[in-house]
Amino acid sequence: MNIVNVILSGGVGSRLWPLSRKSRPKQYLPIFDGKTLFQKTALRNSAFCDSVLVVGNIDNYQLSRKDLQDAGIQSYQEIIEACPRNTAAAIAFAAFACNPEDVLFVTPSDHLIESEESYKKSVERAIALAKDGFIVTFGLKPSKPETGFGYIEADGEEVKSFREKPDLATAEEFIQKGNFYWNSGMFCFQAGVFLQELKKLEPSVFETSYTTYQKIEEGKLNEELSMKIPSISVDYAVMEKTDKIKVVPSAFDWSDMGSFEAIYEYNQAQGYPIDS
């Protein structure tokens, strides 16, 4: 059983245009202590994982390769999507590439995470739950009533509900209740368990993804076959439907760096000069 860090790197960071562009999305900008968010993700998770598997796309896989090389990571797998088909398919491709008992720790490539000890504790708990056959998501304790994230309603590690991005009044209500967490977009599970649930809950995504993966050549997926895959997020496809779901309530510092405000706050926290 290997623990594999699956890095999803297909996003284009459109909310940060023109800083983030299709030719160089935000995860490849070296503006975080001289490193990119992609590099920081791979290096951070190397402490818990035996290997790295990058699911990227035809537009950015060369950037991923360069970032990994510059970070000193020589050994990795890659799957190159011909066209974006959302996260359910992207994660399915990663699961097909691994052994059924392998634990996949799925992370976006463009998140900034601090509080290393707290992060380590949460990841280790998620891996333990995954080894027991659960599908695990991470719930981040909200620092403010954020309207840009989805929320998870929890009772301990039990998931009571997933909630869409709320309006401000609803977000404030979530904060007051104390058992609502930001949906981080990070997951942990055994490859075989995920595929079993995907096949049961969204058979069309499973079958078309499998057919596409069977024709992979030198890490690259076929565009014509890829276009037949339904474009569905992993939240809708599996997380909100499976009875194997668990959540790890977490308190580490986290940001999806999805706005100029987030970058401003990061630079301010790092002590960089800020225009008044």
Regions found by a protein language model. Give the residues of each.
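Left-handed beta-helix
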Residues: 1, 192-276
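Short coil/turn connectors at secondary-structure junctions
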Residues: 1-3, 49-50, 74-75, 100-102, ...
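Conserved N-terminal catalytic core of the sugar/cofactor nucleotidyltransferase
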Residues: 1-7, 18, 30-106, 112-114, ...
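Conserved adenylation A10 loop of the ANL superfamily
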Residues: 10-16
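Conserved beta-strand scaffold positions in the cores of enzyme catalytic domains, especially
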Residues: 28, 78-79, 135-137, 247
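Residue-level signal for inorganic ion chemistry
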Residues: 38, 94, 110, 152, ...
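A residue-level structural signature of the nucleotidyltransferase/glycosyltransferase Rossmann-like core
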Residues: 53, 104, 179, 186-187, ...
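Conserved core of the sugar-phosphate nucleotidyltransferase
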Residues: 115-216, 225
